[in-house]
């Protein structure tokens, strides 16, 4: 899509989403499996304004095996991990259980966007990845390079649901 965005308003929007909706701060390590052609790249890079450290990955998310990104998360002490519903569903289908082999003590939030996150994927994450993590299904748009609905660290996570509308977006 050939869309031009301004920098100032986008950065302010992302700061709101990072600081208030994701509880991102200076000591965090933010990762989102994305290409620089997807709006999530802009969202990821804006994490620098919160003082977070970015973790980048170039390559297949399932090479040399389906748990490659979770090993990265453990080794790099990622605190906020972003991915897609398709990736999580693929892991479940492959029978991957990162929880059994990979320590993820720093991980506190998993974000998922790109399509709706199925209720079964919530079950999979809490059973096979990490039980004490905030799983946020988020929804936004390339045209606004922001989120319409996303997580809230003050609200409970409900299987198959988005937690809340973005502040100022309803």
PLM region spans:
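Short Gly/Pro-enriched turn/cap motifs at secondary-structure boundaries
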Residues: 159-166
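Conserved AMP-binding/adenylation subdomain of ANL enzymes
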Residues: 9-29, 39-79, 94
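Gly/Ser/Thr-rich phosphate-binding loop
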Residues: 49-52, 79-82, 92-159
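Conserved adenylation A10 loop of the ANL superfamily
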Residues: 1-3, 18
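Conserved AMP-binding/adenylate-forming core of the ANL superfamily
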Residues: 4-8
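Active-site beta-alpha turn of Rossmann-fold NAD(P)-dependent dehydrogenases/reductases
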Residues: 34
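Alpha-helix/helix-capping structural signal
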Residues: 86-89
């Amino acid at each position: 899509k050939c869309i031009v965005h301004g920098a100032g308003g986008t950065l302010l929007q992302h700061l709101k989403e990072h600081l208030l909706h994701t509880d991102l701060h200076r000591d965090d390590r933010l990762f989102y499996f994305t290409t620089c052609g997807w709006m999530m790249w802009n969202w990821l890079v804006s994490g620098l304004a919160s003082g977070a450290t970015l973790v980048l990955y170039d390559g297949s998310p399932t090479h040399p095996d389906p748990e490659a990104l979770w090993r990265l998360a453990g080794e790099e002490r990622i605190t906020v991990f972003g991915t897609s519903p398709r990736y999580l569903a693929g892991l479940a289908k492959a029978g991957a259980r990162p929880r059994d082999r990979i320590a993820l003590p720093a991980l506190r939030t998993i974000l998922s966007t790109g399509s709706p996150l199925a209720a079964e994927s919530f079950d999979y994450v809490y059973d096979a990845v990490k039980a004490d993590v905030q799983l946020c299904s988020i929804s936004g748009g390339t045209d606004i390079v922001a989120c319409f609905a996303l997580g809230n660290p003050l609200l409970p996570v409900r299987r198959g649901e988005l937690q809340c509308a973005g502040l100022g977006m309803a």
